[in-house]
UniProtKB/Swiss-Prot annotation:
Organism: Halobacterium salinarum (strain ATCC 700922 / JCM 11081 / NRC-1) (Halobacterium halobium)
Domain of life per record: Archaea
Family: Belongs to the CbiN family.
Cell cycle among keywords: no
Topological relation to the membrane, as annotated: Multi-pass membrane protein
This protein's UniProt keywords: Cell membrane, Cobalamin biosynthesis, Cobalt, Cobalt transport, Ion transport, Membrane, Transmembrane, Transmembrane helix, Transport
Associated pathway: Cofactor biosynthesis; adenosylcobalamin biosynthesis
Alphabetized PANTHER family for the sequence: COBALT TRANSPORT PROTEIN CBIN
Protein name (database record): Cobalt transport protein CbiN
Chain ranges passing through the membrane: 4-24, 59-79
Cystine pairs: none
Described purpose of this protein according to its UniProt entry: Part of the energy-coupling factor (ECF) transporter complex CbiMNOQ involved in cobalt import.
GO biological process, any: cobalamin biosynthetic process
Amino acid sequence: MNRWLAAGGILLGALVVFSFVSAGAWGGADGVAGDTITTINPSYEPWFQSLWTPPSGEIESLLFSIQAAVGGIIIGYYLGRDRPRGQSQDMGSDLP
């Protein structure tokens, strides 16, 4: 019962916090950087253009999610692989 109550409280808290954020606050860093550069130097021209633009926002989100998943797998593998090795070295030091 306490677990469900805690999960419900966390979910309710997240909903309250996110309900106060306007849609404009979710803009990306690229858009903010582009606006700042244009403000500083209106005659600025980019050095290069994208080689490929995803056909839709959903594809772009999918690629970002895959990138995050691969990064998480790599970090998880490293942490999972590194910890047992450190524990086995500690266990061997107690032997006479």
